[in-house]
Amino acid sequence: METKYLKINTADNVAVAIVALPAGEKLIVDGKEIILNEDIPAGHKFALKDFTEGENVIKYGYPIGHTRTVKKQGDWINENNIQTNLAGLLEYTYNPAEVDLNIPHKDLTFKGYRRKNGDVGVRNEIWIVPTVGCVNGIVNQLAEGLRRETEGKGVDAIMAFPHNYGCSQLGDDHENTKKILRDMVLHPNAGAVLVVGLGCENNQPDIFREFLGDYDSDRVKFMVTQKVGDEYEEGMKLLRELYAKASKDERVDVPLSELRVGLKCGGSDGFSGITANPLLGMFSDFLIAQGGTSVLTEVPEMFGAETILMNRCRNKELFEETVKLINDFKEYFLSHGEPVGENPSPGNKAGGISTLEDKALGCTQKCGKSYVDGVLPYGERLKVKGLNLLSAPGNDLVAATALASCGCHMVLFTTGRGTPFGTYVPTMKISTNSALAKNKPGWIDFNAGVILENEPMEKTCERFIDYIIRVASGEFVNNEKKGYKEIAIFKTGVTL
């Protein structure tokens, strides 16, 4: 029998249409007949009771906003008749939650690259990283030259990562650029890196070299284009040296405890919090139980669900760091005259997400139910295993770049609307619905929509774990197959 709706939590006063439902449809919800007063698109909400004006709408067991007007049982609840409860800064109280997941440990491994410093990569690529946007054309030309010369053999990829920054920046923007580029150069998915500078930029190559700290000088080379005659010939000479090293690297067995994944969603819809995001949450809990690491970001998309994360902080210090994480981003919004609750995009709303709380309560499903063990500022690298929260905005390119830069080997990206992009680590797309997976097989890597078709979440997660291990061991995801790899750096200040 086809499932037509889902009431997510027993406390909810709305349900979600699994399929498009016509006006006049009769449904039995908790033993009570509900007659729909209007057409309800798939992924959208309908009222299970009569609402007075200003009454809270409950989904996932929490308020997602309040009604703007009186609504009747069977009415369509959407962004036109529900309003966010979010306002400015809040004071929070630590009410620690008990976490007892009881997930068995399995001795699972993947095939990765063990680096000289003991770290592990899931890819062995050669990267060309510009210190400043002025040399973007050069790094692109060098990457193409090495690909042509080697026919792309011997390493997983040869990529240049152009960006707009590295000069005409001050303060935090300049530091953010340096941090993200440093994190790239030191990332274990790179078997070798050529750093290309101009020579007169704010992000001075010599200072940036010191900023890197310890690095393998056999695997990281520098070229300052103003100091060489023919930058292409000099760059190719250095790349040949790097290729000779990287192309000899081989995969070895690595325990799953060394895997680090970023958790991301974009182009979300009303099914995100029902299928793909809970699937990631189940996987995240499993990975952490094996000793691994997952990272949740998109701080503005935590607004409205932040107390769930705060109360899962392992101690008071982490709770206070999480409060700062949330309120710093709220202050960033307010300092620019922007309301903290204006997040859902047109695509989100078309897909059934009405308010930021609606989005946040679905978004935070991605990190499961584990304790929070770490909180990271933007641009900083992981220090502890387990579940970490990372400061970065919701923008897909900026957030995914930040996840890669903190040390994640891959980004697990759920989507209900679809997106082709990838950051500089494998960016796996998990669809919330089967229609998207069928329509965009060149974008979607794994379909969580089968959960709506009565496949048990546990079975889907077993298949997902197997797929993650295959990808960590070298199987390419779609963004890699197509060469869709790019970076975006968070900018908050002026440009000179």
Model-predicted regions and their roles:
Residues M1-M410, R417-P420, V425-L496:
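Metallocofactor- and cofactor-centric catalytic cores in central/energy metabolism, strongly enriched
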